[in-house]
Amino acid sequence: MGPQRDITRRLLVALVASGAAGLVLAAPSAASTECRAGHGSADVVGKPGPVVAWRAALSSRVPTHTRVPGRKKTRRAGTARTVGPGDAPWLLVLRAKNDRKGRCWVRVRLPWRPNEAGAWVRAQHVNLRPTRWRIRVNLAERTLVLHRGRRAVLRTSVVIGAPITPTPQGLFSIVGVWRWNPADFLGSYILPLTAHSPVLQEFGGGDGRVGIHGRGGESLLAPLGSMASHGCIRLPNGAIESVVRRVGAGGLPGIPVRVR
């Protein structure tokens, strides 16, 4: 995160203030309500793997559960109790299973704290779609790699969090896609993640959400390969533009982002 800037706060303000910047969403189509979706080798909805992962599209708010309901009494997950497209239009599917009645449930990555929070939702309440895209961030090497299946299609050096404000590690997903001013500190695109700073509970008026974004203005002073941000992952504008162009703005929300 740049100096005195919080991605969540800036994005919301910008969306209200200007029609030029906006969240680009994919339009959900016909839903798959089965744990087996019938897409060849990826027909079984399950955990993210090296070849395919699954995204769950939200068209309305749905209840979340800490476990798949069965004989034991269950409670809804977290304080929000429901998750909707205003939180994240697409959620990363972590696994799937059937309940005692044969109904399919999917465990999804939640877009709020704590990091790597997850909950179960009914598969019939979401649209399930496979994706072959994933992103891996190597903190030791200061690199980001975009994969399509097992093939790496883009590799770039990045700026990561400073030692006192480290980039969080874990399995996250992209929340949205924002086109931005290339000359601004945040560069040409911003991809907010489900990740939050492990040390900054709030930042610049927001909740310390971490994202992937470009570089411009003062952020160019920190060279690629350095540890200088408040947790965000900074790419060259050309690299993040290539990510958006290759995957498509509608295909990015919900794809897995592994940071380690």
Go through each PLM region and give its residues.
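N-terminal secretory signal peptides that target proteins for export/translocation
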Residues: 1-8
